[in-house]
Amino acid sequence: MENDKHNNPKTIFIPDDIAEGIFHHLPIKSLARFKVLSKKWTSMIESTYFSHKRLIRTGLPTPNMKFLHISQHFTANFVEEYSNSITFLLETFSRDDQNNRKTFDESQNKTIQVLGSCDGLVLLRIHDDFRSIYLINPTTKEHMKLSPEFMQWPFTLSYLTPAMANKPWRQLSQSVLDYDISVKRMPSLAGFGKDIVKKSYKVVLIYTRYEIHDHEFKAKVLSLDNGEQRDVGFYDIHHCIFCDEQTSVYANGSLFWLTLKKLSQTSYQLLAIDLHTEEFRWILLPECDTKYATNIEMWNLNERLCLSDVLESSNLVVWSLHQEYPTEKWEKIYSIKIDVIRTNQLHEKFWMLGLAAAYFSNIRNRQDQVSFFRQRTISYLPTMISPSNLML
């Protein structure tokens, strides 16, 4: 009987709800180990439901935020303490295809740019014309390729007067008889975020056309739950343009873009889209002296949009947007005297300042490089969400 006890140990079954509760308290590295033990646990850990609950539970005042920096050589580096730095090659985006005996087409003018981040997933593009964009999880190294559709522009336009006079754009109707290949365009801007009502993820594609008298844009939404691409608006923004040096920022169910005054090229307002209603709205910038786009830094802090002038003054002020439907207002949440802080002390609170603190010394000394850092670096919270699991 003693031998039977040793040779036939009892099997212990852990209920799913108890296992999930345990997993919520484990670090990412431990979760990765549990994934290889059970397909059921893999599905649980990679699910958006699990990640949503885990993000809520870890909604601490100092979240475990990391930065992903894409170098010119198509290598991704995690900006952390140097002793713990992690570097991996995004082979999917590698420019050197010699191992596969493929020739590189110099005419493609390959580039890599960060387009946005939400729930630990990062959206990238690798061509100037957006022919391919990728959704990656820097933590698990998984990725999914997305292929935006061409947008066709009408030859004749008819203008509709907006119902609300305070809208600085005109929504357009379109009359189309025929198309020519020259009017087929790929998107010029994109953003990635989550519909917080339906808990589904969406990519917003912006197609711009700037003419002498009018500046128009069309918007498409790519729903990752079903792969559907649909038009959500055709607008004339008239007196302003999108800021090319700023990428979109996701926060609390909306995507935000900075716009500039067309003639002066100075900061104008924020253009936002609610990812549930898929409607655009304008948001005034906070009352500060910021005028130039290169000075403005935007990021997501605890699901609220934050904004700061990172170059103009030694007194760095951080503004946070409160979205209390139907009103939105800015609140000053930090004021930091930069000239009395040594840059090597900023790493402890870099998450407060977004990209500006991660590259603080570089940005202060080389202002012409700000847009380069901004378009190749993004913050994210590590999760185990699998990009391929977003498609049903």
Swiss-Prot record:
Domain F-box: residue ranges: 8-55
SMART domains: FBOX
Pfam families: F-box, FBA_1
UniProt-listed InterPro entries: F-box-assoc_dom_typ1 (IPR006527), F-box-assoc_interact_dom (IPR017451), F-box-like_dom_sf (IPR036047), F-box_dom (IPR001810), SCF_F-box_component (IPR050796)
Protein name, UniProt field: Putative F-box protein At1g71320
Source species: Arabidopsis thaliana
